[in-house]
């Protein structure tokens, strides 16, 4: 009888472990295990453990909002937002115009957000209108919308009448530079706010709090009447339409919200790195964000805030740690090559995997 009880307990424990593994997702367990292995190996190959933790947290804080921008369109049934560069361009316009108008310090960051917002709303409305016309092929069209908008802006960055000596080419006095320093403007405006420094460990508290506010806002919005209607449109548009929900309006709202979050996301990304990059820089920025949320357990039909947090941390952790550890192990300067292999490999995995959504 005792043996029977032990067997039952063992089965219960085994089932519990299997249930937890299924809930978290086997692919995520493997990636998390590999990331943990990299963290453990770091001190043994000469990489400072706390510095690597800091780098991972910093990269998470810079990229999390752009991954969060995926959530509204997934909920409304528009799929993954491969047109993220539209929102990024809105943010870049806000950033450059804020500097052009002479704003400095934290005020330049606030003004960049305010200026970027109408651009995001206008571009998001046009983008949403287009996606409503081609239902079923949103992700393919979104990809080309993103690529073409970046190429178009390559011309506009040269032609738009900017005059700030901080941004324009020195020899011509017109056309924006490829890279613009944010020193004296909003460099580290969030990362330096309430920053915690303990030895080599540095935690960008301000950036994490800013993301937390936006993430909570998104969670709260999805639980409102409008957010519930948006989710219903994504789950079953026919039922939503029968219930009196304007399907096209909900889809357009999700696109506008996603575009606005992308604009905010690139501004946070810039303040972390300390500079603005124009021209072809936004070209492939949608892919890491798409991959991160998929690795986090989302699908093209379902996504949660937990998917955003877990996916961003895993993706950025692997991209940060793999080059550092491998470079120290083989004692060759191949960090950039390894970084590209790791990041593109993660993107390839995320875009080709077929699994059910996890919590």
Task: Map each language-model feature to its residues.
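Cytosolic-side transmembrane-helix boundaries in multi-pass membrane proteins
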Residues: 1-38, 235-249, 311, 320-359
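Single transmembrane alpha-helix segments in multi-pass membrane proteins
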Residues: 51-103, 125, 129-136, 293-302, ...
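Hydrophobic core segments of alpha-helical transmembrane domains in multi-pass membrane transport
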Residues: 30-42, 70, 147-154, 207-219, ...
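Transmembrane alpha-helical segments in multi-pass inner-membrane proteins
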Residues: 256-268, 272-340
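Alpha-helical transmembrane segments within multi-pass membrane transporters and channels
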Residues: 104-150, 315
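Helix-loop-helix "hairpin" substructures at the membrane interface of multi-pass membrane proteins
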Residues: 200-277
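Central hydrophobic cores of alpha-helical transmembrane segments
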Residues: 87-91, 142-148, 305-318
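Transmembrane helix-bundle core of multi-pass membrane transporters
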Residues: 149-222, 331-335
